[in-house]
Amino acid sequence: MSSKVSIIIPALNEEDVLTRTLNNLTLLNPPPQEILLVDGGSQDRTVEIAHKAGIRVLASPQSGRSIQMNLGAKAATGKILCFLHADTLVPNDLTAIIEQVLAQPNIVAGGFISLMTASNQTRWATSFHNYLKTYYAALIFRPHLFFKGLRILFGDQVIFCRRQDFWHCDGFDPELPIMEDADLCIRLCQYGSIYLVDRIVQSSDRRVAQWGEFKANLIYLYIGCLWGIGVSADYLKQFYEDVR
């Protein structure tokens, strides 16, 4: 029997990592209700790989993670939405974990501990910093909400929530080119607590590999601090170039 979870994958030129991710999803028990890949105009084999895997493919009229994820959420039929990056591997019991967490009515959304990995190494320092950021970003910049259950989750943590709650707060802000996930967490928090699941998902270290670990963490910290004091996402985007 399948779960009530719709998995939504925003993608743009992800042929190098997508096959591995889709193969990983075939191991889920119970299987998701559906998997939707929302393509932002890929120029490689991303769409072909998704079609061969037998998953539903949506073509977004514009690229942009917020826009693509909202399009997937509108098309989804599951009662629960799970937003998965194309370079992230999840545990085989992902759907069971999600349904168990959201069975608690006081929890509105959740995510996982992201471990940044490559084929031959694990980025322990960056992964630990990202784990701490879930807590300290909320505590420092939104302390009144932290004590109401706010945790700041990012896309590589595989954010999930009820479809009803997602649309109650109008989904992802399509105007945000960056920090759309943190913004969503703040708006979702009005409906309940955000829960960090004590399980690991594995994300590609490709951005850290290109920037270097010190520079990457410095940029993450810089962007987070500026966002926390209200600097516009359009300005912050210049520091976070796309990496494939």
Label every model-predicted segment.
Residues S60-A76:
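Glycine-rich, basic loop-to-helix element that forms the pyrophosphate-binding segment
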Residues M1-N24:
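N-proximal low-complexity "stem/linker" segments adjacent to membrane-targeting elements
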Residues D39-V47, T88:
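A conserved acidic beta->alpha catalytic loop
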Residues L81:
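Short aromatic/hydrophobic "clamp" motif used to bind/position activated sugar donors
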Residues D93-A125:
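Conserved donor NDP-sugar-binding/catalytic core segment of glycosyltransferases
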Residues F112-S119, F128-I152:
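Short, flexible, basic/aromatic active-site loop/helix in glycosyltransferases
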Residues N24-P32:
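Short, acidic, metal-binding catalytic loop of nucleotide-sugar glycosyltransferases
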Residues I178-L184:
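Acidic donor-binding loop at a coil-to-helix junction in glycosyltransferase catalytic cores
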